[in-house]
Structure formats: structure tokens, C-alpha cells
């Protein structure tokens, strides 16, 4: 039996390393995902993206596939939910769009980095997002592990969308 290079066996410290630099800390139930800051001001569409995709509208850029982040969260014992979606329903003679909310377990997202003065900084991801035009910090947000879905060809949609 061979072990794929994308997963390395846990060390005695309870840490599993995945491809893309992902580190699963089993004892503390933490997943560390390396990233770099793409933009420090401007409008954003999402918090993070893959390199070569939406750097112009994301705060962070990661080099690992979303399916590996999903795997890491499963490795620390979380259960994925289902992403939110829109569904068209016929009501009488009309069609309406119904919002189906996401489901999943709550997660806390923290950001750790060294600032330009060499100081270590740790904050919630919400503290990295400011409202406009008043500049208020984004309110504490209940993030959840929804995962993604698989398309008809069996591909994890978040890996290519």
C-alpha cells in the first residue's frame, strides 16, 4: 500500500500535513492554511481565493485546493453541511426563486501574520473586513463548515469555481 503524497502520516505531536502546506492539529482541532494577503483595501467579493483566480476581489490567496481544506476539517472531526442555494419553484402560474440556506457546524476563522513592523498579529477574519462608507469593522459572524458539492463528473465544485 502506498500513501499519496498529498497526505503525510501524523507525527507523534498529532499533526497531519496535507498538500499545499495545510497543517491539521488533531489535539487542538485546528487547521492552518497558508495564505498571503492579496489586497489591503478596496471592495471584496470573498475572503479567500486560489492563486490565479480572484485576487483582485479577495483578501487572501491560498495555494491549496478547497477539497484539501475540506479534508482537513474532516480530519479534525468536523462534519460538513450543505452550501446554500437557490431553487426555482412554481407557485400557481408563476415561478419564484426560493433561498435555501446553508447548513453546517460552526467554525471560527482566525488570521495570523507578521505585520510590516515584525510584530505577530492574530485576529478574527471579520476584523480584516471594514464596512463602507463608515469604516466600521465587520460584526462577529457565525461561520459554518458547509463544504461544497460534487458535479456530474464527480469533481468537487469549489476546486474549479
Residues of each region from the PLM?
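Long, low-hydrophobicity ectodomains and other hydrophilic envelope-associated domains
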Residues: 3-161
